[in-house]
């Protein structure tokens, strides 16, 4: 099998797997809803109540959510389908997430290199890096927003900083582990050639860290979307998926399908950035294999 046909097969397999996962989620959703409606909101054969109500306000039908995506909604002076409305909002969120992902990756890799170079830095910084992730984001986001506005920073910068806070951690930890992964024999070989530390870093340690970096990038990319949405909700911005979710939550009793549709849009955005990192991983690894061959 040629490399091109193998790539096409993998892509087709990924599409089929994603489609089957969506179908399974819809079947479970509708099956749970049907069961609750048939039994009066209890587990079959028992008097135990289901954990989530199955009425149309709490759990609208999946078909109703899908139909809402093509219904019209007001956007300023114009009217457009909800799917297009969410796509416009997602574009703003994607920009904020991309900035946060970039900054978080740079900071994470920079911290990893610093901790690799000086062991005292690892002992001093790594515990604090771990502790930083115990601070609730919902409490930290308003602080970052207030600080940013006092400094005169645009809202997109403050939101991106919230994404950065979430993304740097997995990159820093995984990058450090990857940079430390080369065998001691390989490191000693570089030393025997009198290779400078920088040469060892770029020629040996960074290539060895690739299998550790890309999984971290995937996690960081999805976290950047979460951070951007939380930031939009905290800052009260007029754009982004976070704003759409907040607005639809306030009108939940009237249009519950719109809130679910906006949540689906956020999930799709997360899957999109995850897919972009996966594609980059395949391209980089394929090029590496070609060079080795």
Which residues does each predicted region cover?
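Alpha-helical membrane-interface segments at transmembrane helix boundaries
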Residues: 87-95, 99, 122, 129-132, ...
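Short cytoplasmic-facing helical segments at TM-TM junctions of multi-pass membrane proteins
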Residues: 174-213
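Generic hydrophobic transmembrane alpha-helix motif, especially the helices
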Residues: 126-170, 177-178
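Transmembrane alpha-helical segments of polytopic membrane transport and secretion proteins
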Residues: 1-23, 275-293
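Transmembrane-helix boundary motif in ABC transporter permease subunits
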Residues: 99-129
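Transmembrane alpha-helices
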Residues: 161-164, 197-231
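Hydrophobic alpha-helical transmembrane segments of polytopic membrane proteins
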Residues: 241-281
